[in-house]
């Protein structure tokens, strides 16, 4: 007859296999975009924020510096030959096709200033400007004067040049040196690391020469350098943490074999959490994996407690079950947060905890061959007599910290670039005078309608002398082209014969006759390359406005977006939402613990995690850090760990002290090491997590372990 435990084990393995199969079917690549974890793609504005951020994040700039322009041109040629072998391409559309259209239909393309002269029928001033341009020996012509006597096409192209984009040329002189800026675009993120290594080798090769220097700017290079350094640091931390756990196992159990079942329980919990999240949501965010590391600490906690209880013949199933249920219910509450990242963390952690719990009570008993015969005995100081002093210090520090508390939702404060990268960005701003950027998104039923809206906005910006970059500048709407042709028709009727003395009568007559035609260019039918540079989707375009500019009064389906400001506003609202969720989590803890134990004991168990969370925020504020969304998220991790400590200390007493200490010290070492990483986001989280765990553990000792 099959034992009841074996039946449960069979069901567990069968469920794991089914979960794996469904996960493989549903699996999509891990989401790495930070914003997509917080923003809702169903919200139109937030969807546009994600897309615009992705566009900005794919832009890479190469700045070449030299005293001689010839050296710069040679370096550019070498760079372009190198880029042909990569998926980093020059961010420039095919201008030859546009110039061909402009030259063929010059009457369709008229700059804002000349349109104003035509509208006001100020033909005298228009004639004067055109003649000055015509007889300028340095002038070039897009179309010859016999076909475009007022040089509309030439003037139109000249007005397309933008100092902030490489429309035609972007070389400047600064402090006695020449600087050329090449705009590049990442076309395939999968090969980005390989391609950037090629680009960095080119930079290093050029920088070895005396007469040339290359700088790299833009999000991709910052991400590459920071992620590589952070990965190296985190790998070192993982190795140290791994070795510390092995050392603890050897020291306490006098055996390394015990490490095998512990490692299996951790792995099982992490895998179950991952598979469940994939089955339910189809995809996982990289930040979910980071924040769900609480499973590792809890897995250690459960495993150590179970193994030590078996060796000491103590029954801790109730404590394990209560710990699992309270934590699972609390994390499931995150499903109602409305934030994608919190939903994923809730599902991952809750399902992973259930997986760890089932593995510990069903599978660990089968691995007794790996158990040691004896355990050590950890002597802990009796700090219960200092409980009042400890609480007083915590309260004072918390009060002072909260009095000085400052919040920050500016995503730019989460990252401090390395010195060389910072110098490159400063040089870029000094030489090329990079202004603030605002995006304007326009949604419409057709490309032509979208362009018409852009033209209305563009007229307002032109009137105020504001530089911008838009689809309508390159491809005017059919309506605007018809208006231009009508104004040129009136111009030729009233002014051509007096103005164009450099043309014979036959040419003038031909020009006048040609102006009667209604030749309008419909760019939507040609699938022009320019469209893809300005369209978020088939019904949405975006304009780029340069410099500080007051918000415009715009119509429906038009949004003004400043990436950093808009994202910061959303981060602020999410941070506030996180804070509002926390009291409900503590309430859930209290209700569940009151059911399992008495209300007074429930309060006592909750008090350590609650006080530790408050102290962690207060201490972080006291040392000068501004509280951001990631500090608040760290509180969820602190709760996951510290609640376990309290439950086991409250019910296991001295028998649980060793397991709790081993679990605590292993996790504390890992988070303390994180505090020394170079990436500010990770280091600030490491500080608050280490402080929160230490405080919670000390409070647990003071509240529950009165005698050694």
Q: What role is predicted for each listed range?
A:
Residues 1-40, 190-191, 197, 204-409, ...:
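Membrane-embedded transmembrane helical bundles of large multi-pass transporters/channels
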Residues 510-560, 564-570, 580, 584-587, ...:
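Solvent-exposed soluble domains appended to multi-pass membrane proteins
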Residues 68-76, 189-197, 447-454:
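Solvent-exposed, non-transmembrane alpha-helical starts
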Residues 41, 93-184, 225, 471-542:
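Extracytoplasmic
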Residues 60-65, 131, 135, 139, ...:
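A short beta-strand structural signal in non-transmembrane regions
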């Amino acid at each position: 007859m099959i034992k009841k435990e074996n039946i449960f084990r069979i069901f567990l393995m069968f469920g794991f296999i089914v979960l794996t199969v469904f996960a493989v079917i549903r699996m999509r690549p891990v989401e790495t975009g930070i914003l997509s974890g917080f923003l809702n793609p169903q919200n139109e504005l937030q969807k546009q924020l994600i897309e615009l951020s992705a566009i900005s994040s794919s832009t890479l700039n190469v700045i070449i510096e030299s005293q001689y322009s010839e050296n710069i041109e040679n370096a550019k040629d070498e760079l372009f030959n190198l880029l042909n072998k990569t998926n980093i391409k020059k961010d420039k559309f095919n201008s030859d096709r546009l110039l061909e259209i402009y030259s063929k239909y010059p009457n369709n393309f008229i700059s804002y200033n000349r349109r104003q002269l035509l509208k006001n029928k100020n033909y005298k001033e228009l004639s004067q400007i055109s003649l000055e341009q015509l007889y300028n020996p340095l002038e070039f012509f897009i179309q010859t004067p016999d076909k475009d006597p007022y040089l509309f096409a030439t003037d139109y192209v000249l007005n397309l040049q933008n100092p902030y984009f490489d429309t035609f040329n972007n070389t400047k002189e600064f402090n006695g040196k020449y600087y050329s800026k090449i705009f590049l675009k990442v076309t395939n993120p999968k090969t980005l690391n390989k391609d950037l290594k090629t680009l960095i080798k080119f930079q290093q090769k050029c920088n070895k020469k005396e007469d040339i220097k290359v700088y790299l700017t833009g999000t991709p290079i910052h991400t590459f350098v920071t992620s590589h350094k952070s990965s190296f640091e985190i790998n070192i931390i993982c190795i140290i943490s791994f070795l510390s756990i092995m050392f603890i196992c050897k020291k306490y159990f006098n055996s390394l074999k015990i490490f095998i079942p512990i490692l299996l329980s951790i792995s099982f919990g992490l895998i179950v959490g991952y598979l469940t999240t994939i089955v339910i949501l189809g995809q996982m965010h990289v930040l979910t994996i980071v924040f769900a590391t609480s499973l590792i600490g809890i897995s250690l906690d459960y495993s150590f407690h179970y193994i030590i209880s078996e060796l000491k013949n103590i029954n801790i199933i109730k404590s394990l079950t209560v710990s699992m249920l309270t934590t699972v219910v609390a994390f499931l509450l995150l499903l109602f947060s409305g934030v994608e990242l919190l939903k994923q963390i809730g599902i991952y952690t809750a399902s992973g905890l259930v997986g760890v719990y089932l593995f510990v009570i069903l599978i660990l008993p089968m691995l007794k061959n790996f158990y040691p015969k004896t355990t050590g005995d950890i002597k802990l100081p009796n700090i219960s007599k200092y409980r009042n002093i400890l609480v007083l210090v915590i309260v004072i520090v918390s009060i002072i910290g909260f009095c000085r508390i400052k919040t920050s939702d500016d995503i730019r404060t989460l990252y401090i670039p390395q010195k060389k990268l910072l110098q490159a960005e400063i040089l870029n701003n000094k030489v090329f005078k990079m202004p603030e950027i605002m995006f304007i998104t326009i949604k419409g039923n057709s490309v032509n309608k979208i362009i018409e809206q852009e033209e209305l906005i563009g007229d307002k910006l032109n009137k105020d002398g504001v530089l911008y970059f838009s689809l309508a500048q390159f491809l005017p709407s059919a309506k605007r082209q018809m208006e231009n042709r009508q104004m040129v028709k009136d111009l030729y009727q009233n002014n051509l014969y007096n103005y164009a003395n450099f043309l014979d009568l036959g040419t003038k007559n031909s020009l006048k006759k040609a102006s009667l035609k209604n030749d309008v260019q419909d760019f939507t039918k040609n699938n022009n390359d320019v469209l893809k540079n300005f369209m978020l989707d088939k019904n949405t375009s975006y304009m780029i406005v340069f410099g500080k500019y007051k918000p415009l009064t715009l119509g429906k389906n038009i949004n003004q977006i400043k990436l950093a400001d808009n994202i910061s506003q959303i981060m602020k609202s999410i941070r506030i939402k996180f804070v509002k969720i926390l009291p409900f989590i503590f309430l859930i803890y209290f209700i569940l613990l009151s059911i399992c134990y008495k209300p007074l004991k429930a309060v006592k168990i909750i008090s350590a995690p609650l006080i530790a969370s408050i102290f962690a925020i207060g201490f972080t504020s006291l040392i000068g850090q501004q509280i951001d969304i990631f500090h608040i998220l760290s509180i969820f991790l602190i709760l996951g760990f510290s609640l376990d400590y309290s439950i086991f200390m409250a019910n296991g007493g001295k028998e649980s002290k060793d397991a709790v200490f081993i679990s605590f010290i292993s996790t504390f070492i890992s988070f303390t090491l994180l505090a020394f990483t170079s990436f500010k986001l990770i280091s600030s989280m490491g500080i608050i997590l280490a402080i929160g765990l230490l405080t919670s553990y000390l409070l647990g000792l003071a509240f529950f372990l009165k005698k050694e």
